[in-house]
Amino acid sequence: MAKFIKGDLIYNEKFDEYAIFLGASQWVGWIRVCLISTGEKSQVHDYIWELA
């Protein structure tokens, strides 16, 4: 997993999606993000995201 800092712009190539990193999730292997396309706050798998 990449080490993201709160506020980092991150990118998911598989889904062509950008998000703002909000922090770690309570679940192992997940992170909290705000999706740029919808503004939705969500928890997602961390391994498919990279720094934009």
Enumerate the predicted regions with their spans.
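Histidine- and aromatic-rich ligand-binding microenvironments
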Residues: 1
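Basic/aromatic-rich interaction segments and small domains that mediate binding to polyanionic partners
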Residues: 9-52
